A protein has these predicted regions:
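Secondary-structure transition/turn motif
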Residues: 52-57, 111-112, 122, 130-136
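Short secondary-structure junctions
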Residues: 20-21, 28-31, 92-99, 117
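A conserved beta-strand-loop-helix scaffold within acyl/acetyltransferase catalytic domains
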Residues: 15-47
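Short, surface-exposed beta-strand/loop "edge" segments at domain boundaries and coil↔beta transitions
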Residues: 38-39, 58-60, 84-87, 115-118, ...
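Acyl-donor binding region in acyl/amide transferases
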Residues: 44-92, 96-102
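Active-site beta-strand termini and strand-to-loop segments that position acidic
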Residues: 33-34, 43, 109-112, 132
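Short amphipathic alpha-helix that is part of the acyltransferase structural core
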Residues: 1-20, 122-125, 136-137, 141
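Conserved catalytic-core motifs of GNAT/GCN5-like acyltransferases
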Residues: 94-126
Length: 142
């Protein structure tokens, strides 16, 4: 069993790193895990949307992939308030294309499986969008 934190401890950590006051977003569902942090999310036809997140990013992204597969969602996006390049590396992606225009950067990334992630920076905020290859849930393969 890993290191656990209370929700209050994760919220303090979130506020310290983001320099923003944490407030529950009533438009999103909320999930907390003592070893992995917390995540606010919303499921819509167009994809899975992750709003406020603190803790183990890799854990929450892995959960997100599973949710996208289960509900056959084509994309997952996350709002990130920290520098994007360390997150890109931690998630196993490499930047294959960089675009810069005015006050934003966009990084197109791929991982070893060929999956795509686009990270767009505007000021200090980042939007990560993963394209999800939906697997056929009706497959009879054993």
């Amino acid at each position: 069993m890993g290191l656990t934190k209370t929700l209050e401890e994760y919220i303090k950590m979130y506020e310290k790193h983001t320099k923003e006051k944490f407030q529950f977003n009533t438009s999103f569902s909320f999930f907390y895990h003592p070893e992995h942090g917390f995540c606010e999310y919303k499921i819509e036809d167009t994809g899975l949307y992750i709003w406020q997140l603190c803790g183990d990013l890799k854990y929450w992204v892995d959960i997100g992939y599973k949710v996208c597969q289960q509900f056959q969602l084509p994309a997952m996006s996350a709002y990130i308030l920290r520098h994007s390049k360390p997150f890109i590396r931690k998630l196993g992606f490499k930047i294959v294309k960089t675009e810069h225009e005015d006050s934003y950067y966009r990084f197109t990334c791929k991982n070893k499986a060929g999956e795509e992630l686009v990270a767009t920076q505007h000021g200090d905020k980042y939007i990560f969008v993963w394209k999800i290859e939906v697997k056929d849930n009706d497959s009879t393969d054993v």
